[in-house]
Amino acid sequence: MIAYTMVGTTDLPRAISFYDALFDLMNLEICWRDDQSSSWGKKADLSYPRFFTGYPFDGNRGSVGNGTMTAFAVHEPAIIDQLHRTALSNGGSDEGGPGLRPQYGTGFYAAYVRDPDGNKLAFICYDA
């Protein structure tokens, strides 16, 4: 259903460093990179959704959407724990530590962070 998501940044090198560390743990590849944006996904599989970060096309400062969040499916709670630690050690901030969230369903395990620009991310597993 989703082809790609893009979040704005005010500092592309910082954003690339943050997302490279996370997506390396998720075995995602760099699909595109230039002086304006970068994307990750599965380079040879155009049906796999990609995630972009970059400077806004209109030239204005990148900003965060209120209520906007990108959730990444992860298959093991231990990887979610590691992603949360990696995000925090690379300039991200905590929005909810790793753990079960039974209010969202049996086995729903998640962690929530913000990237250095304030974009909210979730790492989720449905069958922990």
Show where each model-derived region lies.
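Long, continuous compositionally biased terminal/linker segments
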Residues: 35, 42-82
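Active-site beta-strand termini and strand-to-loop segments that position acidic
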Residues: 40-46, 113-116, 126
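Vicinal oxygen chelate
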Residues: 10-14, 71-111, 116
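A short acidic/small-residue loop/turn micro-motif
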Residues: 102-103, 126-128
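N-terminal beta-strand motif that seeds the catalytic metal site of vicinal oxygen chelate
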Residues: 1-16, 70, 127-128
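Core segments of cupin and vicinal oxygen chelate
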Residues: 7-50
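Short glycine-/small-residue motifs
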Residues: 120-123
